[in-house]
Design a protein with these regions (language model features):
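Active-site metal-binding motif and surrounding structural segment of the metallo-beta-lactamase
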Residues: 94-151
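Structural motif
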Residues: 76-78, 127, 241-242, 301
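Glycine/small-residue-rich hydrophobic helix-like segments
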Residues: 205-208, 212-262
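Active-site metal-binding loops of divalent metal-dependent hydrolases
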Residues: 25-27, 82-84, 133, 224-226, ...
Length: 323
């Protein structure tokens, strides 16, 4: 039994559970001053860009976005984020310069090579869902030739047209995703949220989506960092979940309230922030904090994409292992 009453949906009869296997899709070095306040001017952390293989055992009553295993007898393989590209030269010059500013960094071997080394052909990844479209999350999409790509509402427009935001991290490359195999989730603020298969509230989150329609995986709308930013809430066992938080926060101290979101002065004297909409980002972090207080103790583990201490504790569970 759960230690305390929880807001999470109870397990169904014959409830399917997913497995989640973390991977480090490269490493970059981040200066605290760009992410948290207050901060030491020289404080830096070399952090992973985490990606996660989420494996659904099947069968699939509802197969999202028409994506299905090439062999229906095998599980459904979903990648949440793909980390960094495997080589700096696979980025345009503007992003190569940005990565050089994140030294020391490590890009090799890339997620596709790690999957192969662990016994999974990247061609058997059925779906790639991106928390958002930044360079350190979209990885090498062309190495996943059979996957369907899913982004949050507005994500495809970000890739094709950018966001008009300043800062070297706000650089996007049209054509990064194969448009013929890419889809956006519906607008979480639109009408029809309460309809079957549409966005529904869960605890403090106004918009969540039961992705496989079986209570195993919930997409959580977490706006602020970039249009279409998503978290993924995965049911591992009856009373055990993990929420994959992408870039909702970059530092655990933002969750505890020990730090605030950082800003810095750009070359033109304007104020810059790692989040495109800092106020919405603050609200998403507040909701995460509230969510932690509403679920059963130890029932849900939260992990963001750049948590180096979490990775050091859990790298032994990395693919082909599982959490």
């Amino acid at each position: 039994m759960a230690p305390t009453p929880s807001i999470l949906p109870p397990a169904l009869p014959n409830q399917p559970y997913v497995t989640v296997s973390p991977m480090a899709g490269g490493f970059i070095t981040l200066s605290d001053k760009f992410f948290v306040h207050p901060s030491s001017p020289d404080a830096k952390r070399t952090v992973p860009s985490l990606a996660f293989l989420v494996t659904h055992p099947g069968p699939h009553n509802t197969t999202p976005h028409g994506a299905s295993p090439s062999n229906p007898s095998r599980p459904f393989n979903l990648m949440f984020d793909l980390g960094l590209r495997r080589a700096k030269e696979r980025y345009p010059e503007a992003l190569q310069r940005h990565i050089e500013g994140r030294a020391p960094y490590q890009l090799e071997p890339g997620i596709a090579a790690q999957l192969e080394a662990g016994g999974l052909d990247p061609g058997e990844v059925d779906l790639v869902m991106l928390s958002h479209c930044h360079y350190d999350h979209h990885g090498d999409p062309e190495l996943f030739a059979n996957a369907h790509f899913v982004v949050g509402h507005g994500g495809l427009d970000v890739l094709e047209h950018g966001v008009g935001g300043k800062g070297s991290h706000q650089h996007f490359v049209p054509g990064t995703l194969p448009l013929e195999r890419s889809s956006e989730l519906p607008d979480p603020s639109g009408a029809g949220r309460g309809e079957e298969g549409k966005w529904k509230p869960l605890g403090p989150f106004p918009a969540t989506l039961d992705y496989f329609s079986d209570g195993s995986v919930f997409v959580v709308d977490t706006p602020g960092h970039l249009p279409g930013h998503l978290n993924l809430l995965c049911r591992l066992a009856e009373h055990r979940w993990v929420m994959l938080c992408g870039d909702t926060y970059h530092d655990r101290r933002l969750l505890t309230g020990e730090r605030e979101i950082g800003t810095w002065e750009g070359a033109d004297g304007g104020t810059l922030c790692i989040h495109l909409d800092p106020e919405k980002a603050k609200e998403s972090i507040r909701r995460l904090r509230e969510f932690e207080g509403l679920v059963g103790q130890g029932e849900v583990e939260l992990v963001a994409a750049h948590e180096e201490e979490w990775w050091e504790r859990n790298r032994g569970k990395g693919f082909p292992g599982k959490l």
